[in-house]
Amino acid sequence: LVGSEMCIRDSEVSGYSEPSESEHDFFVIGHTSTSVSLASGLAKARDLKGETGNVIAVIGDGSLSGGEAFEGLNVGAELGTNFIVIVNDNQMSIAENHGGLYRNLQQLRETEGQAPCNYFKAMGYDYLYVKDGNDVEQLIEAFREVKDKKHPVVVHINTLKGKGYKLAEEQKERFHYSVPFDLETGNLTGEPGKGEDYADLTAGYLLQEMKKDPTVVGLSLIHISEPTRRRGIS
C-alpha cells in the first residue's frame, strides 16, 4: 500500500464526512462511490417519517463504476418519491474509466442525452441531460425542472474539470488535489520535507522487488502519486 503525499494533521478538518465535526455529516464515509446508496437511505427515512424535501446525491462519472454506486441506483429507482441523482460527468478518473457504462455515457454526451440506449432510464429513472454543466444558468434551469418531481430522476451534467483555470484544464490529474502552489505558474510553494517520504520509500522498494521477481504486484489504496511514478510501478 502506497501512502498519499497529503497527510491530515490532528488539528485539521478530516478529508471526508465526519459526524463528530459537523451536524451536517450524517455518516463516516471513505473515498468514493458512496453518495447514491447513502442518499437512498436518507430518502427512505424521510418517506417513513412523512417528511418532505429534496434528497440529492452527487456522484462523478469516475465513481459510478464502484459496486456501491450500482447498489444505490438499484434501490433508489424503486423509491417512487423525490430522489435526485446528479451525475457530474467530466470524463476524468485517476484510473482511466473502462466498460459498458462509460460507452453509454459517451453515447449520451454525443447525442445530448437522446441516445436510444440509456442506462439510467433502463433502471427506471427519469433522465435530464445538461449540455454545459459549467454554465450556472443551465444548472439552475435543470434543478428547477426536477426539484418537485415525485419520483427518482438522474440529472446528467457534462462538465470540464478545472474549467476557468488553464493549468487545471490542461493537467487534470496534477490539479485533482494539490498542496499549496503558485496560481500563475502552478509550481508548488513552501519548503518540501527533507528526505524521502513514505510514498518514495515504498515505490523504491517495490521497484527493487519487481526487478528480482516479475510476479510481484503493487496494490494502492487510491493511486500512486504522480502519473510517472505510477506507470513506473504498474
Could you describe each region identified by the protein language model?
Residues 132, 221-222:
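Structural motif
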Residues 17-22, 207, 229:
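Short, hydrophobic/aliphatic alpha-helical segments
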Residues 10, 21-181, 187-195, 199-204:
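Glycine-rich ThDP/TPP pyrophosphate-binding loop and its adjacent helix/strand module
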Residues 135, 212-213, 226:
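Polar helix-capping/helix-linker motif
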Residues 5, 19-20, 156-158, 220-221:
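Short coil/turn segments at secondary-structure boundaries
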Residues 4-5, 9-17, 23:
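Active-site-proximal gating segment of KS-fold condensing enzymes and close homologs
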Residues 201-214, 219-220:
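Accessory "access/gating" subregions that flank catalytic or transport cores
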Residues 1-3, 7-8, 222-234:
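Single conserved hydrophobic/aromatic residue that forms the stacking wall/gate
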